Amino acid sequence: TFEINAMDTFQTFLNACRNGQKSIVKILLERGGIDLNRRDAEGNTALHYACREGYRDLAVLLLEKGADASSANNRGETPLHAAARKGNREILARLLDAGADPDVADREGCTPLMRLVENRRTDAALWLIDSGADTEATDQTGHRALDYATAHGLTEVVARLSQNGSDATDSRDAEGNTPLHQAVYNDQAEVVRTLLAASKAQLDAPNDAGETPLLVACGRGNLHIARMLLDAGADANRPLTNGTTPLHGAAQAGNRFLVEALLGAGAAVDARNGVGETALLVAARAGNNEVVRLLVERHAEVNAANNLQHTALYYAGERGFTEIVELLLAAGAER
């Protein structure tokens, strides 16, 4: 016999669903008196728990017994959102068959597709896209499914969404970042490759801060991605609104090979930023010996002064960078 206090029945039922105990769920349903769509304190129903844990047979049983496929919890999550955690395609299909809206947004504006991508459920995400999910929907911060795929490095999903949405690769988030910006920010080289293959339209597009994807890559010192962007035709001299060029960013990051790649792509060695600094001055002040050495070899103007009339030699001396001081003096820097 299965003795249970009537008051505890609902909690026992929920726990059984949470733990995938289908036989106990069946017994309780046969006894009757269970409200299938009753919510707990967080607003979750039994179906939410079965879907969240990926219990396919249990989810099917609950749906057959009349569970509401569209019930939202306190966070606005439906069973479809819950199913995105494990990404069981059969559960997703059953929920859609039962009338669940594939594009319903939770409190954060996220659709089930976004949650699938966030949980790196590539196969299920591709399936939902093929099932007609809205790929252009945005969450509360202006991000689309493509942005999520970019951030999490799901190249197959990025490729599918780039094919699907005509303007997918041109989309912007709240800070004006394109998917290409986001891939670069997250050091997702394969996603960058996929996006470049889909479209080069946004190659030199600035975000709201004026950064192009190349400027971001150089600021992060990411040589691999910077080379990919340069090979695709990115402008090596496109500056920020304050005059900072990719070369300034690479010099600050201290990546000699990145500086070399930019110079090879036509970056102006003596370009000045808004306060009159050249890349040499930036590198000297940061103590980046190898970058200073390379810039001197490439005939950077060693006596170039910024708006304060300070030179690379001034900053290297002030900060005690002896090797840089010697390099600059040997190249003809004036004390």
Protein language model regions, located:
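Intrinsically disordered, low-complexity regulatory segments in ankyrin-centric signaling systems
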Residues: 2-30, 41-44, 159, 163, ...
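Ankyrin repeat A-helix N-terminal signature
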Residues: 15-20, 49-55, 82-88, 115-121, ...
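Ankyrin repeat structural motif
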Residues: 21-29, 55-63, 88-96, 121-129, ...
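Ankyrin-repeat inter-repeat connecting loop/turn
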Residues: 36, 69, 102, 135, ...
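Ankyrin repeat boundary/linker residues
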Residues: 40, 73, 106, 139, ...
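Solenoidal tandem-repeat scaffolds enriched in leucines and small polar residues
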Residues: 118, 139-152, 164-168, 173-177, ...
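Leucine-rich solenoid repeat scaffolds
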Residues: 136-150, 154-161, 307-335
